[in-house]
Amino acid sequence: MEEEGHDNPPPDIQHAANAAAHQHWDNVLPPILEVHPAVTAFLEANASFIITDPRLPGNPIIFASPGFLLLTGYPIDRVLGRNCRFLQGPGTDPAVVAQIREAVDNGGDIAVTLLNYRRDGSTFWNHVLISGVRKEFDGRTTLLYFIGLQQPIRSPSDDGST
């Protein structure tokens, strides 16, 4: 977890950060929408989700929805380029993390529930669905992105459907 103040930035800095986020989204989204048009529905539903690029070292986040930023309390500049491990903390179950790592390493899809940490250190149970986005090039299917949807739930036994 990160050690930092819990204060919100001044409005002018927050506005600049929001402008930078929207500029980033405008640059990143078009090629993603081309291969996975459902992303538009996720955005319209204010869903919490991220998109990562497994072709880059560490499978970094290349897109974070406004819902993700709201859920986690992190600004866009503290999210992009990082792996989602920054949401883990001392109460996060290593066995669940290993399941996620195995699925991602094998290009597979997975649904798990784990304890995550917001920027302010508060915890939330997170039902996570991770799915690979693939496209066929010259007769070969290539893994382009992972989309990770996050649904905060009340407890590990809650599947998020209530």
Q: Where are the language model's segments positioned?
A:
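N-terminal capping loop/helix in small sensory signaling domains highlighted by a polar->aromatic N-x2-3-F motif
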Residues: 65-68
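PAS-family sensory domains
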Residues: 54-55, 95, 103-108, 115-125, ...
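PAS-family sensory domain signature
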Residues: 71-75, 80-85, 90-92, 98-100
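Conserved, structured regulatory domains from eukaryotic proteins
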Residues: 98-108, 134, 146-158
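PAS-family sensory modules
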Residues: 1-56, 138-139, 143-162
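Conserved long hydrophobic alpha-helices within structured protein cores
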Residues: 37-50, 76-79, 119-126
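Conserved hydrophobic beta-strand signature of PAS-family and PAS-like sensory domains
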Residues: 59-62
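Eukaryotic basic, amphipathic alpha-helical target segments in cytosolic regions
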Residues: 46, 72, 76, 91, ...
